[in-house]
Swiss-Prot record:
Binding site for substrate: S9, K41, L73, K87
Primary localization class, coarse: cytoplasm
Protein name according to UniProt: Phosphopantetheine adenylyltransferase
Disulfide bonds: none
CDD domains for this protein: PPAT
EC number(s) from the headed UniProt entry: 2.7.7.3
Lineage, uppermost ranks: Bacteria, Bacillati, Actinomycetota, Rubrobacteria, Rubrobacterales
Catalytic activity: (R)-4'-phosphopantetheine + ATP + H(+) = 3'-dephospho-CoA + diphosphate
GO CC, alphabetical: cytoplasm
Amino acid sequence: MNIAICPGSFDPITTGHLDIIRRASKLFDHVVVAVGSNLRKQPRLSAAERARLIEKVTADLENVSVEVMEGLLVDFAREQGARVVVKGLRAVSDFESEFEQAQLNRTLYPELETVFIMSASQHSFLSSSAVREIAALGGDVRGLVPDGILETVRQIYSRSDGKI
């Protein structure tokens, strides 16, 4: 079985993330969405809560599962029996950091390949941090996050003081 890992902090999952997951699900036998923590970020929700939101919006994808990932991606990939990491690229600016990460992962797990999927043009500007900022300032995030979690995202990420 060809298993791929689609890792991220998904704080929150966006329509761009979901598009990459859907497209990856057509390329691989099984896709594991790995919800991790970024030491440089303080998410509003726990990894388990973010995983539940992703499960809700990927429920129609039979070959996609969602797991909380702790520790290194390479260790998680080994545990899952995966030899592929799928990453979305929005713009050339994403490539440099993703390339570095892919090279590090390959150093730690030589059998692990990274596959880059270019974002659809309508998602090329989209990021979780932009969604958080828009929601915190009372803006409409419709179309930026999956419909199935729109109200949840509005409630969690909106704040009257405008702080994220």
